[in-house]
Each structure stands twice: as C-alpha cells, then as structure tokens.
Curated annotation (Swiss-Prot):
The gene is spt7. One of its GO terms (biological process) is regulation of transcription by RNA polymerase II. Pfam families: Bromo_TP, Bromodomain. Residues 130-142 have a biased composition (Basic and acidic residues). It comes from Schizosaccharomyces pombe (strain 972 / ATCC 24843) (Fission yeast). This is SAGA complex subunit Spt7. One of its GO terms (molecular function) is structural molecule activity. The keyword Transcription applies.
Length: 992
C-alpha cells in the first residue's frame, strides 16, 4: 500500500503522529512494545487510512479482521490485534500527557521532518511553540502523580492537542516540512529488539508504566511451587535455596506415575514408606529428586551383596532377595513351592519335568552369585509355576490355584527389581570411556550442522532460509521450526548400563517445541513480572495463610459502609495519592516509590468493601493509640478491674497461710514428740507482681495463627482463678485440661456471637451478648455480677477478718502461759537448764544420760546431746493443768453464773427422792462432808515412763512364762505315779 502523507487531510491529530515517530526514533517503544508489536506499529505509521482509524478508534474489531483476511500481507506477524493497538495508543498518549517522562529533544536536529498540514499555519506553529516553552517552564517546577484515566485513552479532542506541550521543535523553514521519513529504510533487525537493553541504558528505567492495566493472575502459577517450598522451609527452619531454582524443571509427586515405577531399585527396601508417600501425594511437596535422596539417605550404606568388582550386584541381588522372601512369606499358597519335590510323593515328577525349580533353590543360587541379570532370575522364578502347570495338567487340581496366585504375585513383585546387567569393573570402565568418546564426536558433528541465518526485512518481499533447532529467539518464523525425532536422538547422550532410566523422547520433543513456540510478551508485562515477583509471592503466602482458617458463608446480607469501616481503604488511597510520579530533583531519576512497595490492585479484591461487623473498633483516633500500646495490657495487681481484686485476695491468702504455719510451729513446740521443720515448710508466696507479658513476635502480621500465644495467656488466667479459688498447688496436667475446657468454651462463645453479628444485625449489642450467654449456660448477666460481688469483692473482706483473728490468736500463743500459775519454772532460770538437760556433762566429757553410748550422736549427726526441755515442760504442764478454771483470771465480757450449792448430808433431803439414796451412798463411801463437782475433780494422771538408768541401758520387764500348762501336766503325772504306787490303776493322760 502506498504511503503519502504529503496531501493527507485525514489526520485529526498531526501532533500525535509526530510524537509517535519521535518515540520510535528514540527507542521509547521498547518500554511498551515487543519486537513483533513494533513491526505492527511501523505499519500503522506508514498507512494514512490505517493511522486515521487507529488514532480515532474507528471499528478496531473490523480493522483486525480486515488485516487477518487481507491476502496482500506477506507476513502473519503484521496482523493487528487489540492488544497491540491498545499498547501503541497508550504509549502515544503517555508521551502527550506527561512529556516530562520522555526526552524527545533529539528530534529537533532534523532527523524527523515535520509534516506540512494545511490546517496548521506557520503563525499557529510559532504561537504553539511559545506556549510550549511556557508550559515547559511551568512543568519543570511542579511534579505530579501520573494518572491513568480511561477517558484519556479514548478521546482525541482538538482542545487537548492545543493545550498539550510537546518537546518536538517545530521547524521554521517550510522547505523542511516536505514528507515524513520513509520508515521502510529502517532496518528493524539492526535495532535493539531485546527491549531490556534499551531499558537498562535509558535514564527513564524507573518510569516504565505498568499500572495502567489490570493483569491476570495466571502468571502466579509459576510461583506456587516456590511458595510451597518456602512454607516447608519456614516450618522446618532449614532453608534450601537451590530447590527454588530447580523447582520449575523438576517433576512433582502429584504426577500420575507411581513411585514404584520411578524408584524400582529402592522400593523393595522401603515398602511401607513408599505406601505412605503414595497415599499422601497431595500433601507432600517434594520432587522426585527429593524422594530419591530421602530413600538414599535412609538406605544403609552397604549390604551383604555389595561387591566393588561386580557393578550392579548389590541393587539386583538385594531386590531379588526381597522378592523371594516376600513370596516365601505367603504360607497359604507357597508351602508346595518352598523345597524340591520328593520322589516319594511324585515318583514320575523328574521324568516329566526336566528342569525342576523351587524357591529354596533360587535362594541358594542367589547366595552362590549364580545370576548376572534380572532376566536370568525371572526365568527361574517363572519356571516354578510353569512346572506346576505342566505336571498338574488337570484343571481342577488344587495346586494349580496356588501356582496361579503365586505367579500373579511374582509378576507384581518383579517390577520392583531393577533391570540391571552385572558387569565387571574392567568392562564397566571401558564402556564409560567409549560412551564419552561417542558423545564428544556426536556433539561436534551436531554443532557444525546447525547454522543460523539472518532474515532480511522488506515490505516488498522477504526471503527466509531453512533453520535448524538452534536459532535466534527473536525471530518468530524461526521459532516455529519443528524439531525432528532424529535430531533429538542424535543429541541424546549414550546410555550407560545400570539403573539409569531411559530418556523420554516424547517429553524432550514436547518441551523443546514449547520453549521455541512461546512468544515474547510485551515489555511492560515482562517488566511487571520481574519487578513484582517478590510482592506477588508475599501476597500468595498471606492469602494461603488466611484461607486455612477462613470460612465462607453462602448467603450474606449486604454490608453497610460506615466511615470507621472504610477508614482502612481511605487511608490507603490517600497514601497512594500522596506519592509523586517524579522526584523533586528532576535531574535525579530515582523514583520515590519503589517497585517493591507498589500496590497491586489485582490482589486487593476487597479494597472497596467495608470490614465485617465487630472487626473495627468504632473509637476516636486518640483511643486507637490505647489499643496499639501492648504494655497497657499487662495483667498484674495494679491492673484495674477484677484481676487486681483477685491478685489482692491471693496475696491475702498467702499471708494467712504464713500465719497458720507460724501457729502450727508454736503448737508443735508444745508436743512431746520430735518435730521436724522440713515437714512443715512455709508456702512459696504467689508471684503477684509478675505481669502477663504478651510475647508478640516481630513478624506478627505474617503469623498464620495466634493460637499458641492466646493459649499461654489463657493458661495464666486459669492459674489466677485456681489460686483465687483456694488451691495451694496443682498439677500441670490438670491446668492444661482446665485451659482446654476454657478455650473450647471461649471458642464456642465467639462462634455464636459471630453468627449473631452476621445474621442478627437488627439486634442491639446488649441483646446479642445476652443471647450468646444464654446459649452457653448463663441465664442472666446478673449471675456474672453476683459472682464478682460475692466471690471476689466480699471475699477480700472475709479474708481480712480471718487474718485479724489469726493474728490475735498467734499473739496469745506467744504469751507465757504459766507465768501466773506457779513459780516452779524458776529452777530453770539462770542457766539452770544445763543441769536438767545434761549439757554440763559435755564440758567434762561424761555421758550423763548415756545418749552417746546408744549411738544417737552418730545417728542424728550432733556433737552434743541433751534432753529437750519441752519433755520436762510437758510433764510440769500436765501436773499444773488440774487447777480449776476459776483460778484463771481473764477479762470476760459477761460475769460467769454462780456455782451450784454443794451437796452435803444436810442438803440431801432437799433433793428428789430418786437420787437421795445414790448421794448418801457416795458420801458414806468416800467419807466426805460434801461431794465434789466433776470439773473440780483432779484428772487421773498416766503412769510415768521409766527413767533411764545411769548406765544408759534400756531394760525391759521380765516376760512371764506360760508354765500353767506344763505345771498342770507335771502335777497330774506326779499324782498318777503316786496312785500307781498305792496300787490303783494306771491311766493314761488325756491328750490335749
């Protein structure tokens, strides 16, 4: 098609056409277009009608269809598409709206000649030049944010073109405005078609625009495997960066191939491990190389079949032995095949069967290293079943059923044996050398065969030479060259005998075609993929963590937007709008907003959706700071509310326990038995000053679950409740059980309240809380108030009263109880205790009480022994305790009642007649003038313990001899003998 812009009047936007040419000449096209899209862009610039329809957006869909059906097109690569038209138009309008982003001053030298348009006069051009200079001066002082509006891309207004400032210098000489440069003379292949080379060399690298379109997220599938690897490494804390790089080229365990077919040489030893891996293939994120490495690590170093001189023997024989032992273990069917057939059982067996075989013989052949390949082993194994079928030819013979079962089982187990031919060390080394030489020769011949050719670009006709596999990646025609199977086989390295599996030729051909046929995407998309890779991976990680615990609701009422609920979205929008497109210093082209922090709107699917009810605290900004200060949530005795009261009650309980221990200690001193202090140790005081510190990690925003942290806090709160209930100590198992019960109760409460918040939006917060507590067993909120009042607040008053009573009782115990009763304790004053306890004998070296002779000093580990004073005091105390209560003086609130009159002989007549006889009898029996009351009678004292003699030996009373039986027998014998002497009959003694 002829191109003539000389007389063209159809160009509505001549300035845009000049900008388009300047972008092409200054290599700014590489920021938006790929090399293929560049060729289409040139065809649009060279065609007047095409340019007019392109710039005015006139039936683009029909335009693409016409280009596809036009037979005059020599190349399919020049077929227009909507994506190319959109990116070309976007590039032109970006340069028009923000000329500061593009340095097009080089076009003023005359490399691009301006078009002489009849509707633009020289005076208008000069006026526009002056306006352009003024606009440039203003734009150099201000910086703004690059805005992308759909209206800017679709409207071409004459008023906008008059106001737009263009850096192109208008040529004052009309003679220079003849025609546009012939773009056919531009050699496209000589230009930088890589796209990124121009980007790296250009100062406008940081100003590549890629946020003006929405990108689909299918490219994230490339990062899924890397994200899974990262999650596994995050759990195990063992990073493996090399697996990220090789993950795209490795096969996943989710393939349809079974593990037994992939690792046949290793599966015989790890049957159960592979069964587990096979059953959990969807949960295990590991490549085939990882599984093979795992099996190699678990496998023991060397087996009994290892032999360095016979390559492949260890793997072959180990697998074969496993198969034989597995077959022998099926005793239900294998009993007839374990040993040779006896001639006694089958006399004609060896006549019919010329080559007998059994499992025992195969096992002996393995021990004798009889087999050199899998084929030989399988032959002997199948010979067992064929011999059985041959000898037992009757179809209903029972052994045929067993043989068929064993044959099927052996065919299943044979797949686990690697196809290996055992070689000697010398033959194996020779084969490696030959294979290496052959691979070098074939690679040299293949390299000389593949020659690339350069394609010439022309509009009239293009010639193209046949190209082999290795071609330039920039040429789409060359990329479509198929790869033959012969070439793949030629480039394949020679196989070495062993367990190495053969190369899948179809997979190689398919992967080669896929790589070569994959077209290059546009520069902006590639730039977006590279620069947003890290942030996209972080988005995927966060989304996967959230989805683990997220529950979707099928039916949901519409959300009501409120200022507090939309605050997060508004703050983010304001923060994004405050970022300038260019830095303050125009000479420095480093952007303020880095690409790592670029917001991806594709992932922000809920940017305009308010948060759910209950998730936003409707408070003022000053109060928001309160909830961000984690130190305010430390729970200790100074915390206001119920926890502080509980801490105070617990502290008061500890003081009461200490006081009880002191009282118990004083009472133990009054007892005669020994007292051991370690049996009554005081309780460890409760750490009431230790706060609950929330150990919030630094990366708490990326934590998948706060369950461990919440569990620890709840356990501490349960501990406080148990101490407040009166428990002195408890087992950790009981505490964990109580914590789990409380956690389950709180989780149910949250779930019920969440349902009410979602479906009960017409109810108030008080009603929601009341109904939630009612479903969980709390009938009324007043029950909670009663618990706080009676069990927490009033308990502090009760504990204070108990502490005061115990304090008074302890003071009374410490007073000298016998100071006003008797002065006999004066004998123990002035160091008189040493004469009583025996301490004076320690200085003289005598053992006064014989305690050292008894070995008590060695037994108790004491240097000096003495009788405890409380033994003597207890006896004295018992002697003095008979005194009536009347002698004890004390302050009493009320006077005691008067005593009853004593009963005498004269007063008996005043009593009732029923007891007069009893009273007279007691008076006569005791010979008393009056009867004593029971409380006036001195208590009967127990007999005193025997004292130790001076020698220190403890003696016991003589034991009584039960001689009555023997005495009676001797007396009866004497009587019988006496009667015998007197002539009476002798009788035998009766046996008892």
């Amino acid at each position: 098609m002829e191109t003539n812009f000389e007389d063209s009047k159809s160009l509505d936007e001549p300035v845009l056409h000049d900008i388009a040419i300047a972008l092409l000449k200054n290599d700014y096209w590489s920021l938006y277009l790929s090399p293929e899209q560049k060729r289409k862009y040139i065809s649009i610039l060279n065609d007047t009608l095409l340019w007019n329809r392109f710039i005015n957006v006139i039936e683009w869909d029909k335009l693409c269809d016409e280009k596809d059906s036009n037979g005059s097109n020599d190349d399919e690569e020049d077929d227009l598409d909507i994506t190319t038209l959109f990116r070309c138009r976007c590039m032109i309008f970006d340069a028009k709206i923000n000329p500061a982003l593009f340095d097009l001053s080089s076009t003023s030298s005359g490399s691009i000649e301006h078009v002489d348009h009849q509707n633009i006069s020289l005076e208008a051009s000069l006026a526009e030049e002056e306006e352009r200079k003024k606009g440039d001066a203003k734009k150099s002082e201000a910086t703004g944010r690059q805005l992308f509006d759909d209206d800017d891309f679709d409207e071409s207004d004459a008023e906008d073109s008059s106001k737009a400032t263009i850096t192109l210098d208008l040529q004052k000489d009309k003679s220079l405005r003849k025609s546009i440069i012939d773009l056919k003379s531009v050699d496209i292949d000589d230009m930088d078609t890589s796209g990124f080379a121009a980007i790296e060399s250009n100062k406008a690298l940081s100003n590549i625009s890629f946020n003006y379109v929405y990108y689909t997220l299918e490219n994230d599938s490339e990062n899924i495997n890397e994200v899974k690897k990262f999650e596994d490494e995050e759990d195990t804390s063992t990073p493996n960066t090399s697996s990220f790089q090789n993950n795209s080229s490795s096969l996943d365990l989710s393939d349809n191939l079974s593990l037994n077919s992939k690792f046949g040489s290793l599966t015989s030893s790890f049957k159960y491990l592979l069964q587990y891996l096979e059953g959990n293939r969807s949960k295990i994120n590991a490549t085939d190389a990882d599984v093979k490495q795992l099996l190699s690590d678990v496998k023991k170093n060397k087996s009994k079949w290892a032999n360095d001189q016979r390559i492949g023997q260890e793997e072959l024989y180990e697998a074969a032995e496993k198969v034989v032992l597995e077959l022998r273990s099926y005793t239900e069917h294998s009993l007839a095949f374990l040993t040779k057939v006896s001639k006694r059982d089958a006399p004609d067996y060896y006549t019919v069967i010329k080559e007998p075989m059994d499992l025992g013989t195969i096992l002996r052949n393995l021990k004798n290293l009889h087999y050199n390949s899998k084929k030989e082993f399988v032959h002997d194994l199948m010979l067992i079943w064929s011999n059985c079928f041959l000898y037992n030819s009757h179809p209903d013979h029972p052994l045929r059923v067993h043989a068929q079962f064993m044959k099927d089982k052996s065919l299943e187990l044979i797949n686990l044996i690697p196809d290996i031919v055992i070689q000697s060390r010398k033959d194996y080394d020779d084969s490696l050398i030959e294979a290496e030489l052959e691979s070098d020769e074939e690679s040299t011949a293949e390299t000389s065969k593949h020659v690339t050719s350069k394609k010439t670009s022309s509009r009239g006709g293009q010639t193209q030479q046949a190209v082999e596999v290795h071609t330039d990646a920039n040429s789409p025609e060359e990329n479509n060259t198929p790869v033959t199977k012969k070439e793949v086989e030629t480039s394949k390295p020679p196989a070495v005998s062993g367990s190495t599996p053969p190369v899948n030729e179809a997979a190689v051909i398919e992967s080669s075609n896929t790589l070569e046929k994959e077209p290059l995407s546009d520069v902006a998309t590639e730039y977006w993929k590279i620069k947003t890779k890290d942030i996209r991976e972080s988005h995927i990680l966060n989304n996967r963590r959230i989805l683990k615990s997220l529950q979707f609701i099928e039916t949901e009422l519409p959300m009501i937007r409120k200022p507090t609920a939309m605050s997060a979205f508004i703050d983010r929008e304001v923060a994004y709008g405050s970022i300038d497109c260019l830095p303050m210093d125009k000479g420095d082209f480093e952007p303020i907003m880095k690409l790592d922090t670029t917001p991806l709107l594709e992932y922000d699917v809920g940017s305009g959706v308010p948060m759910t009810a209950g998730s936003v605290l409707e408070t003022e900004s000053e109060e928001d700071l309160y909830f961000r200060d984690y130190s305010l949530f430390e729970i200790n005795r100074n915390t206001p509310g119920v926890p502080s009261l509980m801490y105070k009650n617990i502290a008061k309980m500890q003081e009461i326990r200490k006081l009880c221990n002191k009282i118990q200690t004083v009472r133990q001193l009054q007892l005669p038995q020994p007292f051991y202090y370690e049996h009554h140790k005081s309780h460890v005081p409760f750490a009431n000053n230790e706060p609950i510190l929330l150990d919030i990690p630094q990366n708490y925003d990326n934590m998948s679950s706060f369950k461990p942290l919440a569990h620890d806090v709840l356990k501490k709160l349960c501990t406080i409740i148990l101490f407040h209930a009166g428990f002195e100590s408890f087992q950790m198992g009981a505490l964990d059980a109580l914590t789990e019960i409380a956690a389950d109760y709180m989780a149910k409460m949250g779930a019920v309240m969440d349902q009410y918040l979602i479906y009960g939006k017409d109810k108030s917060q008080q009603e929601i809380v009341g109904q939630t507590l009612g479903e969980l067993g709390v009938d009324d909120v007043n029950d909670l108030i009663s618990y706080v009042y009676h069990d927490v607040e009033r308990q502090s008053v009760k504990l204070l009263e108990i502490h005061q009573r115990l304090q008074r009782h302890f003071v009374e115990l410490l007073r000298p109880a016998l100071s006003e009763r008797n002065d006999e304790e004066a004998i123990f004053n002035q160091n008189g205790e040493s004469f009583v306890t025996g301490n004076f004998s320690y200085e003289t070296g005598d053992d006064f009480f014989g305690l050292r002779e008894l070995g008590l000093d060695r037994e108790l580990g004491l240097d000096s022994l003495s009788v405890p004073l409380h033994l003597l005091q207890s006896r004295l105390r018992s002697n003095m305790s008979w005194q009536p209560e009347a002698t004890i003086k004390g302050d009493q609130e009320y006077a005691p009642p008067p005593k009853y009159p004593p009963i005498t002989a004269e007063s008996i007549s005043n009593e009732i007649g029923l007891i007069q006889g009893f009273l007279k009898k007691n008076l006569e029996e005791f010979g008393l003038d009056e009867l004593l009351e029971d409380e006036d009678i001195r208590p009967r004292s127990k007999p005193p313990r025997p004292r130790l003699p001076p020698n220190g030996k403890i003696t016991t009373g003589r034991k009584r001899i039960a001689s009555s039986v023997f005495l009676n027998q001797s007396l009866r014998k004497k009587r019988c003998l006496k009667e015998n002497e007197q002539g009476t009959e002798v009788t035998t003694l009766p046996e008892e």
